[in-house]
Amino acid sequence: MSIASVWNIILIILGFGMLIGLHELGHFIAAKWAGIRTNAFAVGMGPVFLAWRGGIGLTFGASKTKVIEKFGKDASDMSDAELKEHGLSETEYSLRYLPIGGFVSMLGQEDGKPDSVSNDLRSYNMCPIGKRMVVVSAGVFMNLLLAAVLFIGCFQVGVRFEAPVIGQIIPNSPASETITTDGTHLQTGD
């Protein structure tokens, strides 16, 4: 495999990670706007590579073990008052090893248990349906916004394409009557 191929694969992975990160950021911003408690914001899947939580700081791996060591239970099990008392933020921001996805973990939205319900007023399921619709569609909105920004950027800067060049002229063809040498650049489509 050539270096160019490896570089292209790296660019694809970074681009995919950016797309997912912005998509999840849309859900995250909308959840915060709706007043929904967000326990985690992650880019990537699998084990945690780096994590940051207010009150704990940057950690290699999840901050959960440090929170439990320091306060006796996980931050996701603490009330808002307990988080404030301990100086912890409600959200753990993490970068994970596999750049194939991402997620926002909201209180009352358990993907593994779709029938789970939380009675907390800041949970996803207690949020009015209109706000939940905004939260669900915010990821798609961010993807559309990114597409618009990229298109505008491409049209402003421009994209260079190689000029069409005649490679070979077949003798006694209509082209041979008008074009005399190989390598001629086409100027118009006529």
Report each predicted region and the residues it spans.
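Hydrophobic, aromatic-rich alpha-helical transmembrane segments
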Residues: M1-I9, I13, I129-M133, S137
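PDZ peptide-recognition modules
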Residues: S2-I3, G61-L88, E110-G130, M142-D190
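Small-residue-rich helix-interface/hinge motifs
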Residues: A4-V117
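Alpha-helical transmembrane spans of integral membrane proteins, capturing the lipid-embedded, hydrophobic core
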Residues: I13-G17, V136, V140, L144, ...
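Hydrophobic (often cysteine-bearing) scaffold residues that line and stabilize catalytic clefts
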Residues: M18, L22, G130, A138
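Acidic active-site catalytic centers that drive phospho-/nucleotidyl reactions
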Residues: E24-H27, R132, N143
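Short gly/ser-rich anion-binding loops that grip negatively charged ligand groups
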Residues: Y93, S123, K131, V135, ...
